[in-house]
């Protein structure tokens, strides 16, 4: 007596769902990672802007500006934060670099820069 043919459609359907579910999970994690990266860029930009604002005044110091930027960046969730402030003759520039939390280990390094003219006292 010949063996009857078995219907294997259920197996291929479950394989399709496994592949589809994996792709959906990867997409979801990618969207979350993108949001974390954008948040990290916002935090780094805010830290750089605050540092420039603190250092550009007539009596502003780069050390105080560096502390302010470090505090903002670390409280915003960035790790391994480095802040470099360059106070030139006419402008001040702040570079903030840090690492955002990573789910997929991509887009974790963040670097933002802000600059502004120095405030000077002038005689009318």
Give residue ranges: language-model regions.
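Alpha-helical assembly-interface signal, strongest on the long, hydrophobic N-terminal helix that forms
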Residues: 1-66
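Short, conserved structural patches
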Residues: 60-124
């Amino acid at each position: 007596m010949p063996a009857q043919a078995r219907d294997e459609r259920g197996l291929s359907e479950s394989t399709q769902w496994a592949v589809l579910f994996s792709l959906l999970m990867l997409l979801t994690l990618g969207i979350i990672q993108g949001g974390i990266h954008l948040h990290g860029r916002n935090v780094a930009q805010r830290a750089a802007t605050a540092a420039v604002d603190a250092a550009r005044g007539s009596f502003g110091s780069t050390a105080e500006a560096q502390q302010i930027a470090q505090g903002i960046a670390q409280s915003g969730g960035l790790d391994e934060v480095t802040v470099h402030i360059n106070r030139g003759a006419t402008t001040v520039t702040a570079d903030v670099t840090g690492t955002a939390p990573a789910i997929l280990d991509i887009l974790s390094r963040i670097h933002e820069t802000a600059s502004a003219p120095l405030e000077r006292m002038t005689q009318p």
